[in-house]
Amino acid sequence: MVQRLTLRRRLSYNTKSNKRRVVRTPGGRLVYLYVKKQRTVPKCGQCKEKLSGIKPSRPSERPRMCRRLKTVTRTFGGVLCHRCLRERIIRAFLIDEQKVVKVLKAQQLGKPVSKPPKIAKAPAAAAAAKPAKTATKSK
């Protein structure tokens, strides 16, 4: 005759978070072992590729993990993969170079470089000179 198994938790439905398997204990009894969800590796924020050098874990485990298991020592380590980071650095460099070239061309032509106009703030003395309004009730 097969041994009957009793649930260790109250939830009896076979949901994603309530998976069970039957295990034989050293004493010869059969009991339910609750299986945890599979751990995942974080993905790159841009290309959605798995990030290498980072330990797979559940989101609830990550706060208890030390930093070296969660990131790699690089700019945007643990957020972007190396290819996307390289692309981003090169793009930023080229944009900066374009700005420098624009300034140099303007200097060669003898034109001053146009800068966005600054917004002047109203003087504080003019604001203080205005009389304060008094609230009067009229019946």
Swiss-Prot record:
Keywords: Ribonucleoprotein, Ribosomal protein. Coiled coil: none annotated. The keyword Ribonucleoprotein applies. PROSITE patterns: RIBOSOMAL_L34E. GO terms for cellular component: ribonucleoprotein complex; ribosome. GO terms for biological process: translation. GO terms for molecular function: structural constituent of ribosome. The keyword Transcription regulation does not apply. Residues 113-139 are annotated as: Disordered. Belongs to the eukaryotic ribosomal protein eL34 family. This is Large ribosomal subunit protein eL34. It comes from Ochlerotatus triseriatus. The lineage of its organism: Eukaryota, Metazoa, Ecdysozoa, Arthropoda, Hexapoda. The gene is RpL34.
